[in-house]
């Protein structure tokens, strides 16, 4: 389904995939669990440095999921940078930087998405107003070569508002098709 960010690996279900971001296990990596008209996945592509995907035979440190492991590494910035992206379905912004002595690094990403234009083609006519927003921050402080502290934070706001106006449903067989129209 192209409206979902969930994925299924052969031999398993979508909830049997393990997702790690910078060695933090993400327990509910998809912000909307229904699988339809979904918002944003937890992983923000503007912040990603590496992606490792295993579909079997992965290390024991990854635990007990059956299908796959998606291990994502976020960037370790060395200088100030950023990006802005805009499309018909949403927008994204990211900033990254490091202190002069490179002990403190930070990544901040914000995204907004709306499937409103795609949903207008649904058989149920009405006013669709889906809005998905998230902000992620990753801060790392390195005390010395052996000690460092890293924190990741995530804020998400997902709203799906729908005011139905009418629906037309077609059913039956090819030579006896019936339509039901509801206002």
Question: Regions from the language model: what does each represent?
Answer:
Residues 115, 126, 148-183:
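Flexible loop and strand-edge segments within Gram-negative outer membrane beta-barrel domains
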Residues 4, 14-16, 46-48, 65-69, ...:
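Extracytoplasmic
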């Amino acid at each position: 389904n192209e409206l979902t960010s969930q994925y299924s690996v052969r031999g398993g279900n979508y909830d049997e995939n393990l997702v790690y971001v910078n060695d933090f296990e993400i327990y509910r990596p998809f912000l909307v669990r229904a699988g339809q008209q979904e918002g944003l996945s937890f992983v923000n592509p503007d912040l990603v440095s590496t992606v490792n995907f295993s579909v079997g035979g992965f290390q024991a440190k990854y635990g007990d999921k059956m299908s796959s492991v998606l291990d994502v590494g976020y960037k370790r910035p060395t200088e100030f940078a950023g990006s802005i992206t805009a499309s018909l379905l949403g927008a994204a912004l990211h900033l990254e930087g490091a202190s002069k002595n490179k002990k403190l690094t930070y990544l901040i990403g914000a995204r907004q998405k709306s499937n409103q234009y795609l949903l207008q083609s649904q058989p149920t006519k009405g006013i669709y107003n889906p809005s998905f927003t998230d902000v992620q921050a990753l801060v790392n402080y390195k005390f010395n070569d052996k000690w460092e502290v890293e924190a990741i934070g995530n804020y998400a706001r997902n709203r799906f508002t729908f005011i139905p106006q009418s629906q037309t449903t077609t059913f039956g067989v090819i030579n006896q098709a019936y339509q039901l129209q509801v206002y």
